[in-house]
């Protein structure tokens, strides 16, 4: 079974990340991904970068992935507002 930790490691291996959180039940996952690689990118392009990092795992193992993709500055603002 696919675990949140294994999804996290795959994302981190394929994308330079400052922070990654993944929760899920083995098929359905939620992720928060913070990366400088998202600077200047629209939400759709950010998600495409994460899908590319996941590669075949996204097609073969993950049924659904809900994600929040943030730059470090956006993450800091979100944490400060909380």
Indicate residue ranges for each PLM-predicted region.
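C-terminal structural segments of small proteins and small subunits
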Residues: 52-82
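A short interface-forming secondary-structure element
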Residues: 32-45
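Solvent-exposed beta-strand sheet faces enriched in polar/charged residues
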Residues: 23, 32-34, 68-70
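Short, active-site-adjacent cap segments at secondary-structure transitions
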Residues: 28-30, 75
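N-terminal first-folded block
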Residues: 1-27
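Short, non-transmembrane amphipathic alpha-helical segments
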Residues: 7-11, 46-60
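Histidine-centered active-site/metal-ligand motif
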Residues: 28, 47, 63
């Amino acid at each position: 079974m696919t675990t949140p930790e294994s999804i996290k490691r795959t994302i981190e291996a394929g994308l330079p990340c400052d922070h990654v959180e993944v929760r899920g039940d083995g098929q359905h996952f939620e992720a928060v991904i913070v990366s400088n690689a998202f600077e200047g990118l629209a939400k759709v392009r950010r998600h495409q970068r994460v899908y590319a990092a996941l590669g075949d795992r996204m097609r073969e193992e993950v049924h659904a992935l809900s994600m929040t993709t943030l730059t470090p500055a956006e993450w800091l603002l979100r944490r400060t507002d909380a």
